[in-house]
Amino acid sequence: MSIAQDRGIVFKLLSIYRAAAGIFMALAQLIVIFFGYCDFKIKGYRIASYNAPTFASSFIILAVCLLLVVVLENPEVKVTNSENSLFSALKQFFRVERKKLISCLILLWSMFLSSFIMSEVVYFMPLFLTLHVNWDTKFQGIAFMVASILGVTGSYFAPKLINVGCSCGRAKDGGLEESDTTGSETVEVKKKDSLYSGQVFLSIFALFVSLLGQAFMIGASEALKHKSMPPTNSGIFFSAGMSITLLGYNFLASSIPALFSMYIDPKLKVQLMPSIGAISGIGKLVAPIVLAALYGTRLGLSIAVGFGMILVAVSIPPLIWLRKKRC
């Protein structure tokens, strides 16, 4: 199997995994919808729609953790000096040629950005739909479930969009592959280039899709603020913006890890995996802090989502550079 085919299959499998995870995340909103009907008291403490889904989710997570403790086995791990191992891996990462290092840093920033975008949607969804539109928890659950299902189509269609570009490249090189065996290496290089260009283009396209979704969210907020649209219509408009933003997020989250794997040695990537995961996780930790501070200003939601749009916009030129300056 060629390297291009192998990478294409891995990219497709990762996208399928993301699509499945997104669908289960969307279906999890059924818990929110079901427990949104709760309204009773336990020794004076009221369990209602605003806290019942949280309690239910906590107990489900606890049950899953206990199940994993019973089912999973703890494999034997070879004892190594993890500090030296991580330190040497970091030194090896930063000692690569300058252009490759810049490319890796651009992709790491894109991973951070994708998690920031996701947190932006999750943060503002309850704020806007509860405080401004006055939707009940169950209606918010329905809105987020629909937005998640529509957004997760990004993971489903990502490999198909990549395959369109790759199939065009294969059609052009088909004659060479059949007529000249010595040209197989050239064909393989062209396939890899086609796969790479397609994934970078998908990443750039994802950022533009995210910009469109964020613009919808700001538009819904401003329309409600100036009473240009009824609250229910504003809520639907805002949910449409969430769907589009999540679509861009899933496109980006499908393509960026695959691109990063092209720039880094597989063994080095395994050693740095905790650090790479931490960079993505930082986006989810930073987003609520930054967005809450901006939301507290006079412009509120508009300036907070606008800040996210600025981050997305400034990330487009580096990806364009990445497409032109492949290492």
UniProtKB/Swiss-Prot annotation:
The keyword Transmembrane applies. Keywords: Membrane, Transmembrane, Transmembrane helix. It comes from the Eukaryota. The keyword Cell inner membrane does not apply. Residues 41-51, 126-141, 221-235, 297-300 are extracellular. It is found in: Membrane. SUPFAM superfamilies: MFS general substrate transporter. InterPro entries: MFS_trans_sf. It is a multi-pass membrane protein. One of its GO terms (cellular component) is endoplasmic reticulum. This is Uncharacterized membrane protein YNR062C. The chain crosses the membrane at residues 20-40, 52-72, 105-125, 142-162, 200-220, 236-256, 276-296, 301-321. Residues 1-19, 73-104, 163-199, 257-275, 322-327 are cytoplasmic.
